[in-house]
Regions:
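Active-site gating loops and adjacent loop-to-helix segments of metal-dependent hydrolytic enzymes
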Residues: 23-43, 102-124, 158-172, 228-267
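Metal-associated gating/positioning segment near the N- to mid-region
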Residues: 10-84, 102-106, 174, 203-206
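Histidine-rich, glycine-flanked metal-binding segment
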Residues: 1-13, 376
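Divalent metal-dependent hydrolysis catalytic cores, especially in the metallo-beta-lactamase
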Residues: 48-74, 88-98, 148-161, 189, ...
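Histidine/acidic-residue-rich catalytic or RNA/ligand-binding cores of hydrolases
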Residues: 28, 75, 104-106, 161-163, ...
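Active-site environment of divalent metal-dependent phosphoester hydrolases
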Residues: 22-27, 68-73, 100-101, 109-110, ...
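His/Asp/Glu-enriched, well-ordered alpha-helical/loop segment
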Residues: 35, 185, 189, 252-256, ...
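Histidine/acidic residue-rich metal-binding segments in metalloenzymes
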Residues: 77, 131-232, 248-249, 261-282, ...
Length: 380
């Protein structure tokens, strides 16, 4: 006999999807130490833990756009183990290693850049870091050979790394074009970490499928994105203290992060307004490497709500739009016959409570009910 679950006192939704989650660390407070001091095996354990915790929070599918701490393919082993039922956890779509250049946002040896000998040792561990068209063509082929679902590139600098900035292009045009052409020849989509509008526009012209962050967006670029059917995963959470300016909280950040948030705050605020008002295809992703634990995906809902995005657009992004970005729209993203029974329920008011997605009351993945956990930081 079928089990009856009474959810009449909750709001029922499809299982949520986080389209930008780096799964390979235990605690955001110690992420830099984990980069350098934990083994690939330990990082794979972190991925398992993250997958279990995200499922318990109502996010039945997550997208991993490259390892922050890891250099290997543990995320693919975890993905396959979940699919085979050996372990429980959110469904994973993964690009195990992002492609990047020396000194770029993806070059985690920057932390040792004042000790070149040690920095070079760490740099050489990141096998998807290199230079030249031929290197990156082969890197794309290797990622696909080992099981990557899509390709991720670090096209510009970022906020969290010490010796680059969001306005820098960090691969040359030939490298960028070669990556996209090769991935498309092999039937894979490409997404890029990118901030500045000139680089967004260049990537669009080269044939990019999607872009992450895009936080310095302008209206001209937004229209190009629409015209070329490119998706954007804007990841609001990492920039909240700058967008909703909070100088006290900014002062608690690490030095290089703090300096960039202050420097770019006006541009981040302007970009947020463009993103909020544009008609681009927006996905829901968190990228919480410096603000909250990676599995607390509900914080992005709070960020969207407090930016005036509206509940329906936010939930649409976290379900149907994300299912399309992950190329799983025939299986997840809506509740309808023929799709997986991925279901979540929420007792807080999704229309008015910005913390609603941090307090999951029920979760089912592929017809199996799992225990839920609410956000560790919620007090009520």
């Amino acid at each position: 006999t079928a089990e009856v679950v009474d959810l009449s006192d909750a709001t029922v939704t499809p299982g949520m999807i986080d389209a930008h989650m780096h799964m390979d660390y235990i605690d955001w407070h110690t992420i830099r130490e984990e980069v350098y001091t934990t083994s690939e095996e330990a990082k794979t354990i972190a991925i398992i833990r993250t997958a279990q915790k995200t499922l318990s929070r109502g996010f039945t599918t997550v997208r991993h756009p490259g390892g922050i701490t890891s250099n290997g393919f543990g995320v693919l082993d975890v993905k396959r183990a979940i699919e085979k039922g050996y372990i429980t956890g959110s469904r994973i779509v993964a690009a195990p290693r992002f492609l990047c250049a020396a000194g770029s946002h993806g070059d985690l040896s920057q932390g040792f850049a004042r000790n070149p000998e040690l920095s070079n040792i760490v740099q050489n561990l990141r096998l998807s870091l290199g230079a030249g068209k031929d290197f990156f063509v082969n890197a794309v082929r290797e990622e696909i050979k080992y099981g990557a679902d899509f390709i991720k590139i670090m096209a510009t600098g970022g906020f969290f790394t010490p010796y680059d900035n969001p306005s820098q292009q960090q691969m040359n045009d030939e490298e960028l074009k070669a990556i996209m052409d090769t991935a498309h020849e092999w039937g894979k989509t490409v997404t890029a970490h990118v901030y500045s509008v000139d680089h967004m526009q260049k990537l669009i012209k080269f044939g990019i499928d999607g872009m992450e962050h895009c936080s310095l967006m302008d209206e001209e670029t937004a229209q190009m994105i629409i015209d070329n059917d490119v998706y954007v995963v804007p990841t609001f959470c990492p920039y909240e203290e700058a967008v909703h300016y909070d100088p006290v909280m900014i002062q608690t950040k690490q030095e290089e992060y703090r300096i960039k948030l202050e420097y770019y705050k006006d541009a981040l605020q302007a970009g947020r307004e463009v993103i909020k008002n544009c008609k681009c295809k927006l996905g829901y992703g968190t990228d919480m490497v410096a603000t909250h634990q990676n599995y607390e995906s509900g914080y992005e809902f709070k960020a969207w709500m407090e930016s005036g995005m509206g509940t329906f657009r936010t939930l649409h992004a976290a379900t149907k739009v994300n299912s399309e970005i992950l190329q799983l729209e025939d299986k997840i993203g809506t509740l309808e016959p023929g799709k997986y029974a991925d279901i979540a329920a929420w007792k807080r008011d999704l229309m008015t409570d910005p913390y609603a997605l941090l307090d999951c009351a029920f979760v089912m993945k592929e017809g199996v009910i799992y225990p839920t956990e609410k956000c560790e930081e919620l007090t009520d």
